Amino acid sequence: MVLSRGETKKNSVRLTAKQEKKPQSTFQTLKQSLKLSNNKKLKQDSTQHSNDTNKSVKAKKNGTSSKKTGTQRKRISTQRFSLFTYGNVQVMNSFVPIHNDIPNSSCIRRNSQVSANNVTESSGVFFNDTQSQDSQNTIKLKPTSLMAKGPIEIYQICTGFDKLKENIAPFQKSSKASSHDGHVVNYLSIGRHGDIVHPVLPKLQITRLNGAGFKYFISFYNPERYWEIEFLPLISQSQSELENSVKAFENVISKICQFSHINEGATIGNNESLSDKFKLPPTSDIEPPNTEIINNDDDDDDDDDNYDDDDLNYLLDEEYEQGCTDNSFSVISNTCSNLNASFLYPSDPTDAVSISINEAFKNAIRRTAPVLNIPIAAPSIHSKQQNKRYSSYPFIDSPPYLQDRHRRFQRRSISGLGDL
């Protein structure tokens, strides 16, 4: 039994070998050939794709490396030149109030301010009323805050130059911009760590105030803003060294921006406006009101004093209140007419305050004066009312002896006393 089993195994192996040796059909051979060709094509495509990816990666690497080298070259071509340095400077931010009011109201306010400021002075100062956007019509220059204190530096940045010659001064290149393809920009740096950096353009205006130390005013496109730069002496520095450094500063800024001088006499007080530099000549459209004082004779002065006494007696004496009749109307009308005729703008600074106060008091009397239409033979009711105080009388509006325009103008003039 054992042998039979071994023989059967051998026979089965021989049969399988014979079956494999049998020739295959044409369909099977075609199928196998197609499989082999497809496998070869897939291998070739995969190899080509891998080669393409390797080439693209190499090209990208080469492009990034070239870009890096290009940026490095640009950085090398940009150079910084220091034109001026100084160690001790104080910078104040100044504000200039500009009024854009109606010309008449602005005249009144400014005249009141001038009269108040010049009470203790013998000469008065009058401002021009011309206002425009281009001109800087200022009243006072007020330093508001300290911006920086420390060193100052003016430097220049040159970009786009292939080769920079060392023997040419940097600020001379800016004057010949057409001879090269580069770009030149000047900057003003203030502070230890460059706290304030501002570009110095050719249209920037820098003005020196002569006679008040070493002060310079930088004006911007906003006419209400100024920078006041003051050069302070360093430790153990002589006056001549300070003057030399200031001259070097002026020499540099005169070549890169607009630089000018102005005298101290053109200003009003300390740290105040640059008056004549930013003024325009007066135009025919806007004219200030004529300020005159009529010198009356002694008789006119006595008459005015009598009118003032009458007004005061009319307010204070009770006996005069009891005996007031239609004659009071003539007194009030005469005072009103005289005041209306002599209502003028004072220009003398010594008498400006007193005259304005008297006029305001007279105007107040005119407004509060009652119009009493009481007959001579008054009944008992009126006699009781006459014994009362002045504040208890029933007031009646006075007739319109002045036009509305004059009333408005008088109210403005009285309100202007608040500035005094």
UniProtKB/Swiss-Prot annotation:
<feature type="compositionally biased region" description="Polar residues">
    <location>
        <begin position="45"/>
        <end position="56"/>
    </location>
</feature>
<dbReference type="GO" id="GO:0045033">
    <property type="term" value="P:peroxisome inheritance"/>
</dbReference>
<dbReference type="Pfam" id="PF12634">
    <property type="entry name" value="Inp1"/>
</dbReference>
<feature type="compositionally biased region" description="Basic and acidic residues">
    <location>
        <begin position="1"/>
        <end position="10"/>
    </location>
</feature>
<feature type="compositionally biased region" description="Low complexity">
    <location>
        <begin position="30"/>
        <end position="39"/>
    </location>
</feature>
<keyword id="KW-0576">Peroxisome</keyword>
<feature type="region of interest" description="Disordered">
    <location>
        <begin position="273"/>
        <end position="309"/>
    </location>
</feature>
<keyword id="KW-0597">Phosphoprotein</keyword>
<comment type="function">
    <text>Required for peroxisome inheritance.</text>
</comment>
<feature type="region of interest" description="Disordered">
    <location>
        <begin position="1"/>
        <end position="75"/>
    </location>
</feature>
<protein>
    <recommendedName>
        <fullName>Inheritance of peroxisomes protein 1</fullName>
    </recommendedName>
</protein>
<dbReference type="InterPro" id="IPR024758">
    <property type="entry name" value="Inp1"/>
</dbReference>
<keyword id="KW-0472">Membrane</keyword>
<comment type="similarity">
    <text>Belongs to the INP1 family.</text>
</comment>
<dbReference type="GO" id="GO:0005780">
    <property type="term" value="C:extrinsic component of intraperoxisomal membrane"/>
</dbReference>
<feature type="modified residue" description="Phosphoserine">
    <location>
        <position position="273"/>
    </location>
</feature>
<feature type="compositionally biased region" description="Acidic residues">
    <location>
        <begin position="295"/>
        <end position="309"/>
    </location>
</feature>
